[in-house]
Amino acid sequence: MTKQILVGGVPIGGGAPVVIQSMLNTKTTDVEGSLKQIRQLASAGCQIARLAVPNMEAARSFADICKDSPLPLVADIHFDYRLAIAAAEGGASKIRINPGNIGGEDRVKAVVEVCKDKHIPIRIGVNGGSLDKRLLEKYGHPTAEALVESAFEHLELLEKQGFYDTCVSMKSSTVPTMVAAARLFRTKCDYPLHIGVTETGPVRQGLIKSAMGIGALLLDGIGDTIRVSLTDDPVQEVYAARDILKAAGLRKDGVNIVSCPTCGRTRIDLIGLVNRVDEALKNCEKPITVAVMGCVVNGPGEAREADIGIAGGDGWGMIFEKGVQVEKLPYDELLPALLKRIEAL
């Protein structure tokens, strides 16, 4: 079991449920816009949000955002240790730094002192795209071993100051490298791990890479908090993270939709129906399985196994509830009837 840290009261590691994070894509200086996005993330199921703090103006805005945020906030810091101190003093629940790029040991010590005083954990964020040149020369390119060595070098900097309230991430845009780094790290250390594939590309590729990388580790029992990185609205990252956790069997809240890929036997607009069901239930917290099937081959069987489901016919469909057929309706009446019954469950 990993060590546990507390981020604004949210436990990470130590056997706690895996925590979902995301990062805002607003300008941090846009206080109202940032708060609006934080609230959207919270409504989608995000538990911790991270913001970029690139300068002192952003640090001042970050402090204003912290006052009204419904979520614990992480300040993402690079290069200037004074920004980390300002963010910690402004209300950050966690500081994300790369100790190797904020200056000498005295500057790391200054950050550690304020985080110790305010009981703020630090995430060491190692990234394959910003490894130290020395490690690149040693390993040739950003290998898993290079990422892990960088993480331990940074951990040592904090431990020298007596600081152990730490979480670690080792991210790569290459799935096998990220997975190998996390597995190697876990054999050597019990600090909690923040896992994710970085810079994943367009949404379709990003979802596949994230599901493979994060999912592989979760099935190994590795990973205490996750962030799905997508070139898209951050809210979509949260929905994807929830789905990954549900697919890995680590979350039971929310709807699990079972639907067939359609074939020549389908006689209803199943694709349209499934998309409408998914949209209507995306914020439903009921831990239920909903089957939306296109024909009578597998449809009745899947619908019977689900909590509630539809099996399509020729322009009509049957609704099953707890294995029992309860209604046969025209296609246009299926969705409202299904949603009404789900509401009553």
Across the structure, where does each feature detected by a protein language model lie?
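Hydrophobic or amphipathic alpha-helical targeting/insertion segments
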Residues: R82-R123
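Active-site mouth loops of central-metabolism enzymes
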Residues: G15-G33, A52-P54, L71-F79, L135-V148, ...
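Alpha-helix-loop-beta-strand connector modules within alpha/beta enzyme cores
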Residues: M56-I77, A110-I122, L184-L193, V277-E279
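Glycine-rich, proline-tolerant flexible connector loops at the mouths of alpha/beta enzymes
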Residues: N25, D30-V31, A42-C66, R96-G104, ...
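N-terminal amphipathic alpha-helix/helix-capping segment at the start of soluble metabolic enzymes
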Residues: M1-M23, K116, E279
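N-terminal active-site wall of soluble small-molecule enzyme domains
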Residues: K36, L41, R50-G90
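Catalytic alpha/beta core domains of metabolic enzymes, predominantly
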Residues: N127, L135-K282
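Hydrophobic faces of well-ordered beta-strands that scaffold small-molecule active sites
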Residues: V18-L24, A49-L51, L73-I77, I95-I97, ...
